[in-house]
């Protein structure tokens, strides 16, 4: 996605201008925030679970329901986990979610506990932790506001609440936020 955006920009404005800019996904910015915070606090950066996250979903599903998850169960559970995290749902809101996933609140808790046991985070957690750091550490927020003064979000209709909150926070000082999207294609409803 970022390389495609860079190529499109270079085609219109030229390669020299494209080289002076950074093109990142919101997850890419989140990763930079976590790396910078780890460097500043001299802590080990978080490990992001990839295949481990899928394994944790399967194990959590089996542990909570007593059933082996089908491919559809895994897909649906992962989608619900992503939705809950990206919409910044509270535990009560998760308990009250309208979902087809049997015992989802318990699976959600078990899944997150398994990630903690492995000392890992998933890609959704990466955004959650990055936003918390930006909200709670003014020096880190100031650094990223200085580093990134202009924001263009493509496919803005697909941004989640947490992604929207992060962009709002980063661009709050400069007010240089440009979002492009098609509301008829929105996957979130806020």
Where are the regions a protein language model picked out?
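P-loop NTPase Walker
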Residues: 1-43, 142, 161, 185-187
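Short alpha-helix boundary/capping elements
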Residues: 2, 30, 34, 85-89, ...
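ATP-hydrolysis module of ASCE/P-loop NTPase motor domains
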Residues: 18-20, 39-124, 148
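Short acidic/histidine-centered micro-motifs embedded in hydrophobic/aromatic stretches
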Residues: 26-29, 77-83, 129-130, 147, ...
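Conserved helicase NTPase motor core
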Residues: 49-53, 99-190
């Amino acid at each position: 996605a970022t390389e495609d955006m860079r190529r499109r920009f270079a085609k219109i404005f030229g390669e020299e201008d494209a080289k002076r800019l950074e093109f990142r996904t919101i997850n890419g910015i989140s990763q930079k925030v976590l790396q910078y915070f780890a460097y500043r606090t001299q802590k080990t950066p978080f490990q992001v679970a990839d295949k481990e996250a899928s394994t944790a979903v399967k194990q959590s599903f089996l542990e909570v329901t007593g059933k082996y998850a089908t491919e559809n169960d895994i897909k649906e559970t992962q989608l619900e986990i992503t939705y809950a995290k990206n919409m910044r749902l509270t535990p009560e809101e998760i308990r009250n979610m309208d979902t087809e996933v049997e015992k989802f609140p318990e699976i959600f808790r078990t899944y997150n506990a398994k990630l903690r046991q492995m000392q890992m985070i998933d890609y959704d957690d990466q955004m959650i932790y990055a936003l918390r750091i930006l909200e709670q550490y003014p020096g880190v927020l100031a650094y990223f506001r200085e580093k990134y003064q202009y924001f263009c979000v493509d496919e803005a209709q697909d941004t989640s609440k947490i992604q929207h909150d992060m962009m709002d926070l980063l661009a709050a000082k400069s007010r240089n936020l440009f979002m492009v999207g098609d509301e008829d294609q929105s996957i979130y409803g806020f």
